[in-house]
Amino acid sequence: MGLPWYRVHTVVLNDPGRLLSVHLMHTALVSGWAGSMALYELAVFDPSDPVLDPMWRQGMFVIPFMTRIGITKSWGGWSITGDTVNDAGIWSYEGVAASHIVLSGLLFLAAIWHWVYWDLDLFRDERTGKPSLDLPKIFGIHLFLSGVLCFGFGAFHITGLFGPGIWVSDPYGLTGKVQPVDPAWGAEGFDPFVPGGIASHHIAAGILGILAGLFHLSVRPPQRLYKALRMGNVETVLSSSIAAVFFAAFVVAGTMWYGSATTPIELFGPTRYQWDQGYFQQEIDRRIRASKAENLSLSEAWSKIPEKLAFYDYIGNNPAKGGLFRAGAMDNGDGIAVGWLGHATFKDKEGHELFVRRMPTFFETFPVVLVDEEGVVRADVPFRRAESKYSVEQVGVTVEFYGGELDGVSFSDPATVKKYARRAQLGEIFEFDRATLKSDGVFRSSPRGWFTFGHATFALIFFFGHIWHGARTLFRDVFAGIDPDLDAQVEFGAFQKLGDPTTKRQAV
């Protein structure tokens, strides 16, 4: 035909067999990518420290998605929780990867078969003998099957009736594990952070899909509606499919970026809003107050803070700190976290406890300012020493650590105090290994950031694709200059197939 590159997909118009073939091949590529990517990630993933070097710090992208629906063990003998595993069973990380690759191969063979044997009687209209697809019926079949799958996932997999459940954690991402979840049928089911809503929504949406599928299988569309929405034209299917995909992409970009029960912070890392709102800082403060109420010393109180919780309260784990075009995992930026130095507490010579003002998300540099509990500035690291009134040297600031590796250690040397004050701007202070990965010290985003950016971007592109193909199918006659009264049935009941000399033409 000599088609330009942007029109090559017209070869599958009026060719149901090869339309099916290219969709099989597309699914083979998607499944093959998923399996191959999983094997690659498993080859580079280090499961040895789930607290300070979790999957999201290592830039894992598909492992978190497997984990959130119940895969936690590896044939390599490790578990995501850090336990040793003797028998991981068939549905290990590697088992899931292998199954996707096997499926990809089978789909590849099916695609070749349908490309070769494209002219099946199944695809021919009995009345006219021409290639034809009953698109409303196909829509009903797909709706019914996806409804069954959706219902089955909610009613069996998530609830644990026949399946492992899903990843469930506490609000601070400390106690996460895979467990069965009961559906939440009340108003709480609409809370995006309630796991029970995932089960109930899958069950409800599945039932709706099954009923809608049966409806579309048993009821034919009215002729006026069929013609108005161009239901006989396969480009209508393309347009509405793109609409469904871009809508879903926008939704998941939101649930990923703002956080939800479907995107646990143990698997995808914290959200930027948890840093902006001091979410983990407030929980740590609450725990310290509770310990002090039990007459524990500051050292004992801070020693009870889980290292995992302290690590969340560090700006380097904020997905908005990494630039969108800085490639690589978080570990390639600030390094592999080795240990928590402890909580730095600053005091001036008058005995006021001072708090370092934390860096906001979108700042690369920020003045080092120390305030008392009433927010009054008591000390700083001045830009111009000649005019300074609150410098660390003048105010006599000291720092003492509680909990962590430097528990009980204090420093009064101004240079050391300023060093830790600068680091306290970034939240809790950790020691990092930057040598192993040759980390460059520049923050990277977590998979949460990459997923959001990718899905929001593609959703926007697909939105325009929906408008484009929707306009093409609704106004095809206008664009093509074809007489609207043309009665020859071509291209699934619409108009002439571009470049195909065999379709009937209107006599000039």
Swiss-Prot record:
Keyword Transmembrane helix: yes
Details of cofactor binding: Binds multiple chlorophylls. PSII binds additional chlorophylls, carotenoids and specific lipids.
Disulfide bridge positions per record: none
Single GO term (MF): chlorophyll binding
Signal sequence, renumbered to the chain: none
InterPro entries: PS_antenna-like (IPR000932), PS_II_antenna-like_sf (IPR036001), PSII_PsbB (IPR017486)
Gene3D superfamilies from the UniProt entry: Photosystem II CP47 reaction center protein
Subcellular location: Plastid, Chloroplast thylakoid membrane
Keywords, in A-Z order: Chlorophyll, Chloroplast, Chromophore, Membrane, Photosynthesis, Photosystem II, Plastid, Thylakoid, Transmembrane, Transmembrane helix
Gene Ontology annotations of biological process type: photosynthetic electron transport in photosystem II
A Pfam family matched in the record: PSII
Location (main, coarse): plastid
Gene Ontology CC annotation, any one: chloroplast thylakoid membrane
The family this protein is said to belong to: Belongs to the PsbB/PsbC family. PsbB subfamily.
Subunit structure as annotated in this protein's UniProt entry: PSII is composed of 1 copy each of membrane proteins PsbA, PsbB, PsbC, PsbD, PsbE, PsbF, PsbH, PsbI, PsbJ, PsbK, PsbL, PsbM, PsbT, PsbX, PsbY, PsbZ, Psb30/Ycf12, at least 3 peripheral proteins of the oxygen-evolving complex and a large number of cofactors. It forms dimeric complexes.
UniProt cross-references to NCBIfam families, sorted A to Z: PS_II_CP47
Protein purpose: One of the components of the core complex of photosystem II (PSII). It binds chlorophyll and helps catalyze the primary light-induced photochemical processes of PSII. PSII is a light-driven water:plastoquinone oxidoreductase, using light energy to abstract electrons from H(2)O, generating O(2) and a proton gradient subsequently used for ATP formation.
This protein's name: Photosystem II CP47 reaction center protein
The encoding gene: psbB
